[in-house]
């Protein structure tokens, strides 16, 4: 069994603290841990574990960790919300990044089902697990 040049990463589900204050109007990216693997770029196929929290309530609305399997997708081609496509660029495999996504880069005024209300700012902590 050969190891990917991008590496495989062992991590645990992160906790996200309640943000308080007013949400930002622009995308906010904060590297909590810088990875040492390959860098995510537009067109890269990646897998990422994440926890998503609503800014207004601090409540978790989704987490790949709860399903035991990371989300796999291609960066920058619209398979995920714009905040993810933009917020993951330049992230390296093995890294952990906090991304605060304003509504216009998330689910906008429509929200997402019953889990995310319209106009909600989203907080994600994303672990880039693999890429190619």
Model segments located where?
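Cross-family detector of peptidyl-prolyl cis-trans isomerase
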Residues: 1-132
